[in-house]
Amino acid sequence: MAVPKKKTSKAKRDQRRATWRRQAALQAQRALSLGKSVLTGRSNSFVYPEDEDEDED
């Protein structure tokens, strides 16, 4: 069975966790910003289909 040769230090463990948490926080911030822009109608990167059936009548 494969096992690590040496125990990972607490500093290395904390450094990795800090990196993961920083990346998660950045993604959460981007998602929140994107959601806000969609809700306020300021986003230009989304194309919404318009109902043309109502206009033709």
Curated annotation (Swiss-Prot):
Residues 1-24 are annotated as: Disordered. The keyword Ribonucleoprotein applies. InterPro entries: Ribosomal_bL32, Ribosomal_bL32_plant/cyanobact, Ribosomal_zn-bd. Keywords: Ribonucleoprotein, Ribosomal protein. It holds the Pfam family Ribosomal_L32p. One of its GO terms (molecular function) is structural constituent of ribosome. The keyword Ribonucleoprotein applies. Coiled coil: none annotated. One of its GO terms (cellular component) is large ribosomal subunit. GO terms for biological process: translation. Residues 1-20 have a biased composition (Basic residues). NCBIfam families: rpmF_bact. PANTHER family: 50S RIBOSOMAL PROTEIN L32, CHLOROPLASTIC, LARGE RIBOSOMAL SUBUNIT PROTEIN BL32C. Belongs to the bacterial ribosomal protein bL32 family. This is Large ribosomal subunit protein bL32. It comes from Gloeothece citriformis (strain PCC 7424) (Cyanothece sp. (strain PCC 7424)).
